[in-house]
C-alpha cells in the first residue's frame, strides 16, 4: 500500500488529479490528525503567553494575605507585578551610541 494518495498525470485536457484510496482509514486518520495539529498550533501561537505563564506560575494566585496589613499587601502586589512585567519582555532593546 502506498501512502501517495494523489497522482498528477498529463492528459489531453491538461493536468488531472487522480485520488486513489481516499476512503482508506489510514488516510482519514492522518487528515484528522493533521487538521487537529494545525488548530492546536494556531491556538498555541495566539495564546502562548497566557498558556505558558499559567504553566509557569501555576493556578495559584499566591500565598494567602489573610491577617497581613494592607500596606504590606500592596507592597507584595507591586513586587509580583514587577516580576510579571519583567517576564513579559521577550526582546531586549540595545541602544548603540
Curated annotation (Swiss-Prot):
One of the GO BP terms on file: symbiont-mediated suppression of host autophagy
Gene3D superfamilies cross-referenced by the UniProt entry: 6.10.250.1640
Record field: transmembrane: 23-43
UniProt-annotated site: Seems to be involved in pH gating, residues: 41
Annotated lipid attachment (S-palmitoyl cysteine): 50
GO molecular function, one term: monoatomic ion channel activity
Intervals, Virion surface compartment: 1-22
Membrane topology, Intravirion segments: 44-97
Residues with the Phosphoserine modification: 64, 82
Keywords from the UniProt entry: Disulfide bond, Host cell membrane, Host membrane, Host-virus interaction, Hydrogen ion transport, Inhibition of host autophagy by virus, Ion channel, Ion transport, Lipoprotein, Membrane, Palmitate, Phosphoprotein, Signal-anchor, Transmembrane, Transmembrane helix, Transport, Viral ion channel, Virion
Residues the record marks as site: Essential for channel activity, possibly by being protonated during channel activation, and by forming the channel gate and the selective filter: 37
Region listing for Disordered, in residue ranges: 60-81
Activity regulation, free text: The M2 protein from most influenza A strains is inhibited by amantadine and rimantadine, resulting in viral uncoating incapacity. Emergence of amantadine-resistant variants is usually rapid.
Primary location: virion
GO cellular component, one term: membrane
InterPro entries, sorted: Flu_M2
Membrane topology label: Single-pass type III membrane protein
Highest taxon above the source species: Viruses
Role noted for this protein: Forms a proton-selective ion channel that is necessary for the efficient release of the viral genome during virus entry. After attaching to the cell surface, the virion enters the cell by endocytosis. Acidification of the endosome triggers M2 ion channel activity.
Sequence similarity: Belongs to the influenza viruses matrix protein M2 family.
Further comment found in the protein's record: When the channel is activated, one or more imidazole moieties of His-37 probably become bi-protonated.
Subunit record text: Homotetramer; composed of two disulfide-linked dimers held together by non-covalent interactions. May interact with matrix protein 1.
Domain notes: Cytoplasmic tail plays an important role in virion assembly and morphogenesis.
Official protein name in the record: Matrix protein 2
Organism (species): Influenza A virus (strain A/Budgerigar/Hokkaido/1/1977 H4N6)
Record gene name: M
Amino acid at each position: 500500500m502506498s501512502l501517495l494518495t494523489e497522482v498528477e498525470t498529463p492528459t489531453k485536457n491538461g493536468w488531472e488529479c487522480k485520488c486513489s484510496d481516499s476512503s482508506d482509514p489510514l488516510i482519514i486518520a492522518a487528515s484528522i490528525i493533521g487538521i487537529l495539529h494545525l488548530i492546536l498550533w494556531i491556538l498555541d501561537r495566539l495564546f502562548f503567553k497566557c498558556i505558558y505563564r499559567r504553566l509557569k506560575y501555576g493556578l495559584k494566585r499566591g500565598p494567602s494575605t489573610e491577617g497581613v496589613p494592607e500596606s504590606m499587601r500592596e507592597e507584595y502586589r507591586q513586587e509580583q507585578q514587577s516580576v510579571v512585567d519583567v517576564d513579559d519582555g521577550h526582546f531586549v532593546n540595545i541602544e548603540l551610541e
